[in-house]
C-alpha cells in the first residue's frame, strides 16, 4: 500500500495508466483502501467545517460498499477522499495504487468536444493510441445505447444522456475500482431509472470490481451492496453486512439513528 496522491482532475479515473485490464483479477485479500482516523475540515482553521471526523475503515478488493445517510453527512467527501481528490486534514489514507479507478459524480464533467472524443481522450491520456481509443469509445457508447450520438457535442445532450456518457467513459477504462457519488441525484425519474439500470448492469458484468457508492435508493443498496456504511455528521455510526443493516432488530438496538434513517427512507 502507498499513500494516495491528490489529483487535480476529477473527470477521469485514477489508478494505473494504459490499456484495458489483462491477466488475473485482484484477489479478495487485496486491501484497496485503509483509512485511519481520517478527518477532513474545510474553511479557516478557527471556523473549520468538519466534513469527516475520525473515520477509520478498510475496504477490500471485490467488496460492494454502500454509503448512506442524510444529505450533508459526508458521503461525497468520503468518496472524494478515497479517489484522491480531497486530502485528509489529519489521519491517514492508503490506497492500492496499482488498481485502476473511475468515479461518477452527481453532475458529469464533460468537455466541449464530441461524445466520442470525451471518452477517447481519457483512454489516450492513459496510453492508448488515439485510433484505438476512438474504437473503444464507440464500443462503450454502444453499451449505454448512445452510439448514434457519438459525433454530437456532449454539452448538447440531456442530463440523463450526459450521465450515460459518463458511464460509458468509466466503462471504457475498465476500472477495478468504481466510485459513485449519487450519479442519478439530479435526473428526472425516467432518466434515473435508465442510469440505475446501467449501473446495476455494470456491476453485474464485473463481479471482481470493487464498488463504493453513495445512494438514497435503498432498493438499489439491497440489490448491489454486500456492506452498508451509515454516516451522520461526518462520522461512521454503523458499518454492517447488508442483511444485518436491513434486518431490523440489530440495527434498532445497536444503531438507533441509522434505524430511524432507514425507517424514514422506506416510508
Protein language model regions, located:
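Helix-to-loop junction immediately C-terminal to a conserved catalytic motif
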Residues: 83
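Catalytic Walker B motif of ABC-type/P-loop ATPase nucleotide-binding domains
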Residues: 178-181
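H-loop/switch region of ABC-family ATPase nucleotide-binding domains
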Residues: 215-216
Amino acid at each position: 500500500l502507498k499513500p494516495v496522491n491528490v489529483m487535480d482532475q476529477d473527470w477521469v479515473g485514477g489508478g494505473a495508466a494504459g490499456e484495458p485490464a489483462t491477466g488475473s483479477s485482484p484477489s479478495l485479500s487485496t486491501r484497496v483502501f485503509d483509512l485511519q482516523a481520517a478527518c477532513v475540515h474545510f474553511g479557516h482553521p478557527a471556523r473549520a467545517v468538519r466534513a469527516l471526523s475520525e473515520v477509520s475503515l478498510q475496504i477490500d478488493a471485490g467488496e460492494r460498499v454502500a454509503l448512506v445517510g442524510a444529505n450533508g453527512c459526508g458521503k461525497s467527501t468520503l468518496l472524494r477522499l478515497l479517489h484522491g481528490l480531497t486530502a485528509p486534514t489529519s489521519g491517514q489514507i492508503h490506497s492500492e495504487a496499482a488498481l485502476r479507478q473511475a468515479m461518477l459524480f452527481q453532475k458529469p464533467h464533460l468537455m466541449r468536444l464530441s461524445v466520442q472524443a470525451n471518452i477517447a481522450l481519457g483512454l489516450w491520456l492513459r496510453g492508448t493510441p488515439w485510433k484505438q481509443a476512438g474504437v473503444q469509445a464507440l464500443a462503450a457508447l454502444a453499451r449505454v445505447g448512445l452510439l448514434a450520438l457519438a459525433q454530437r457535442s456532449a454539452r448538447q445532450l440531456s442530463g440523463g444522456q450526459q450521465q450515460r456518457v459518463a458511464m460509458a467513459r468509466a466503462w471504457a477504462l475498465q476500472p477495478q475500482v468504481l466510485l459513485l457519488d449519487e450519479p442519478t441525484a439530479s435526473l428526472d425519474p425516467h432518466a434515473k431509472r435508465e442510469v440505475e439500470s446501467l449501473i446495476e448492469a455494470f456491476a453485474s458484468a464485473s463481479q471482481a470490481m470493487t464498488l463504493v457508492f453513495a445512494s438514497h435508493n435503498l432498493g438499489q443498496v439491497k440489490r448491489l451492496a454486500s456492506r452498508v456504511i451509515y454516516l451522520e455528521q461526518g462520522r461512521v455510526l454503523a458499518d454492517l453486512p447488508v442483511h444485518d443493516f436491513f434486518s431490523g432488530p440489530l440495527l434498532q438496538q445497536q444503531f438507533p439513528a441509522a434505524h430511524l434513517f432507514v425507517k424514514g427512507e422506506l416510508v
